[in-house]
């Protein structure tokens, strides 16, 4: 099949347009003549998606062999839009779900030093920080393993969700795109649909034939850390095989804040992978390997002030992840079954937390494996639609050692079966999913302590479900609702921890009697999609029974937060449960009053409350908004804007009758008189930002350079979700420069 892409206004060929055929899982880029050619395609209906920086994305439904030669026209637009269907608008396989997708120019502008930093600022998404590296995404107030982070659809196999000082072992610079999935489709990946799923898409294993060498090279620098990041990817044919090679590295020094240099925030990181597959019109089979290493610091002090319980010499984390993956898919020529696919991985993970002089305080080791088998189908007739059924299995063996560690070894086994379906009736679309999860956790160390009793095996199992409905009104308006019932088993750490965690400044104690969380969520949402107006808004209410959280333990003698029994240095946090309610709103509006000029505004707000006491839940993000004026053409872009972060004064009450402070003073109050960060309010801030970018096609290669200036006013501000906020503010003024060459 031959595809020609032209500019809708000038009718000239458009170079470097990314074309994808979803059903065939093939991707191509147009050359100097605006053409691309696809081979080994199945006959029947195919969905072609065209994306190019500076143009509105476009979707076209094709029918082979009739549409063997196709011409499509792209319209210049500065708006961040979903792909617009221009043929068969009422087709039965159209999908709608509340998702966020970052790719192209939007990904370049947002690209940060981590996945969480890249997504922060999107509606409903913020990040929890413990320095510039140890960050984690928070979706609608939920974090940890309530938010699944995947790489090409499989879990990473790291321990990022177990503590705030642990980093996600996936780099955003080499991602093709990053998706956030909510609603019924999230049940294809996990049982907790109240949070969400973040999928970093790279396609390590090529899924389609490759007929020529393609790739991308990236180089990024930033002033706040004097950091440099580089990366490259190439996909090439080697005989009958498709090969993909990728690598990236990062070298950054300590971060600069308006209050001075923040020690122990430097980082060195490498990431490399290679994938090989055989691919044809009926599917593919292949494998890949990847190696990720990182050494980074966790800040504990600034300007002579040290967080109570922190090591004066700082903490460094040294980690390595090695993973292998097999991936395959078969697509029948005809029938209701459209594909049968499977993927499995084996991951070896090691992490050491180093004190002054390279002394190992804690060492983690984990071996994990998972597999997924999915059958996708399509129906025709009165109940036309599509869906998927599948099975999933996971095994995880986590060990810990060190001079005095509170993390206990355990083995986790899990199995799931799930299904998802969607159908349409003219303007009405219905979507639903169901999943059953069984989880078994066996501790390998059962010795009780003063604070941890009744250590034993635990088994959990339950159903999760989600349903959604959308209705298309005139004038490009779509309204809908979704209802979800979610299940989450307690994590290993929540059950069995019993000791200090140096890099998170806490003595953490689990609770082997914890019950599984059970949540019920309701969403109401609306979307407007017009040529010069794009808007979406959502109201949500999530009620969680037996919500698990870490709370400071009160010392019965003093009324102050309890300190660890050995050194009386760390605040003791213990896993607790309470009925919780999380409710809020989020939205985004984009308006293009003049061609190429866009006003863009987003707002996110969430409130967490214990339903039994009506007290606020700890570690809830404040409301956050973003406004931006953007000018974008196919050749250049520019923007100015502001991030507005609200004050967070809605915090859990301090222990009754306690006289303590939230301020850390050099040589002042004793450590025991300083309240933990989650019991302290945080002021708001307004951060100005600006960006400019240039794109040129030279010798059939797209060159793009983007400059972004964050925190233009060098404002001193603090992150409410960081346990070290009383000591250290966030980064100051930062100039980021990104260069990409696509070939």
Language model regions located:
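Transmembrane beta-barrel wall of Gram-negative outer-membrane proteins
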Residues: 223-251, 261-297, 316-334, 375, ...
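Conserved C-terminal beta-signal and adjacent last beta-strands/turns
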Residues: 270, 277-281, 317, 331, ...
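Flexible loop and strand-edge segments within Gram-negative outer membrane beta-barrel domains
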Residues: 258-259, 263-267, 283-340, 346-370, ...
């Amino acid at each position: 099949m031959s595809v020609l892409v032209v500019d809708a206004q000038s009718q000239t060929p458009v170079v470097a347009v990314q074309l994808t055929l979803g059903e065939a899982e093939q991707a191509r880029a147009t050359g100097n003549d605006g053409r691309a050619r696809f081979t080994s395609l199945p006959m029947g209906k195919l969905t072609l998606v065209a994306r190019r920086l500076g143009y509105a994305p476009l979707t076209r439904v094709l029918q082979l062999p009739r549409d063997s030669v196709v011409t499509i026209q792209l319209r210049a637009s500065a708006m961040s839009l979903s792909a617009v269907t221009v043929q068969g608008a009422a087709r039965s396989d159209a999908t709608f779900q509340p998702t966020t997708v970052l790719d192209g120019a939007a990904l370049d502008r947002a690209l940060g030093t981590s996945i969480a930093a890249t997504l922060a600022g999107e509606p409903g998404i913020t990040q929890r920080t413990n320095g510039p590296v140890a960050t984690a995404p928070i979706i609608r107030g939920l974090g940890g393993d309530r938010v699944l982070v995947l790489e090409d659809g499989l879990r990473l196999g790291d321990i990022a969700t177990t503590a705030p000082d642990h980093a996600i072992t996936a780099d955003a610079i080499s991602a093709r795109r990053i998706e956030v999935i909510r609603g019924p489709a999230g049940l294809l990946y996990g049982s907790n649909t109240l949070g969400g799923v973040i999928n970093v898409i790279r396609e390590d294993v090529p899924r389609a034939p490759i007929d020529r060498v393609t790739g991308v090279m990236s180089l990024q620098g930033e002033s706040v850390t004097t950091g440099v990041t580089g990366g490259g990817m190439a996909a090439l044919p080697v005989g009958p095989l498709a090969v993909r090679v990728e690598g990236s590295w990062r070298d950054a020094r300590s971060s600069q804040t308006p209050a001075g240099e923040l020690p122990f925030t430097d980082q060195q990181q490498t990431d490399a992978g290679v994938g090989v597959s055989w691919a044809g019109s009926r599917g593919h089979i292949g494998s890949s390997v990847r190696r990720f290493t990182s050494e980074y610091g966790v800040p504990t002090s600034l300007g002579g002030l040290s967080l109570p319980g922190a090591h004066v010499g700082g903490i460094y984390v040294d980690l390595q992840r090695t993973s292998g993956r097999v991936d395959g898919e078969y697509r029948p020529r005809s029938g209701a079954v459209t594909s049968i696919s499977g993927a499995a991985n084996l991951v070896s993970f090691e992490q050491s937390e180093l004190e002054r002089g390279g002394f190992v305080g804690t060492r983690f080791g984990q071996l994990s494996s998972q597999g997924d088998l999915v059958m996708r189908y399509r129906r025709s007739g009165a109940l036309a639609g599509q869906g998927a059924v599948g099975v999933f299995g996971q095994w995880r063996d986590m060990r810990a050692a060190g001079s005095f560690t509170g993390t206990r070894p355990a083995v986790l086994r899990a199995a799931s079966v799930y299904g998802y379906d969607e159908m349409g009736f003219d303007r009405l679309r219905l979507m639903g999913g169901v999943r059953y999860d069984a989880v078994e956790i066996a501790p390998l160390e059962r010795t009780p302590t003063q604070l941890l009793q009744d250590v034993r095996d635990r088994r959990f199992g339950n159903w999760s479900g989600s349903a959604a409905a959308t209705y298309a009104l005139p004038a490009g308006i779509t309204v809908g609702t979704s209802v979800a019932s979610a299940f989450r088993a307690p994590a290993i750490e929540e059950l069995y921890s019993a000791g200090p965690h140096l890099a998170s400044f806490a003595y953490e104690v689990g609770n082997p009697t914890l019950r599984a969380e059970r949540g019920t969520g309701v969403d109401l949402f609306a979307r407007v999609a017009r040529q010069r107006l794009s808007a979406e808004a959502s109201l949500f209410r999530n009620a969680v029974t037996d919500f698990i959280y870490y709370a400071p333990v009160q010392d019965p003698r003093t009324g102050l937060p309890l300190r660890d029994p050995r050194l009386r240095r760390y605040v003791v946090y213990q896993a607790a449960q309470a009925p919780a309610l999380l409710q809020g709103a989020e939205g985004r509006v984009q308006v293009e009053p003049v061609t190429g000029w866009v006003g863009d505004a987003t707002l996110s707000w969430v409130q967490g409350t214990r339903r039994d006491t009506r007290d606020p839940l700890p570690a809830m993000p404040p409301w956050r908004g973003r406004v931006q004026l953007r000018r974008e053409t196919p050749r250049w872009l520019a923007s100015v804007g502001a991030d507005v972060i609200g004050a967070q004064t809605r915090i859990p009450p301090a222990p009754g009758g306690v006289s303590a402070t939230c301020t850390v003073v050099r040589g002042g109050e004793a450590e025991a008189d300083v309240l933990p960060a989650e019991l302290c309010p945080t002021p708001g801030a307004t951060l100005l930002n600006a960006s400019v970018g240039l794109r040129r096609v030279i010798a059939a290669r797209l060159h793009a350079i983007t400059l972004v200036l964050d925190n233009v006013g060098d404002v001193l501000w603090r992150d409410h979700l960081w346990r070290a906020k009383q000591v250290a503010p966030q980064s100051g003024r930062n100039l980021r420069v990104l260069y990409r060459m696509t070939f």
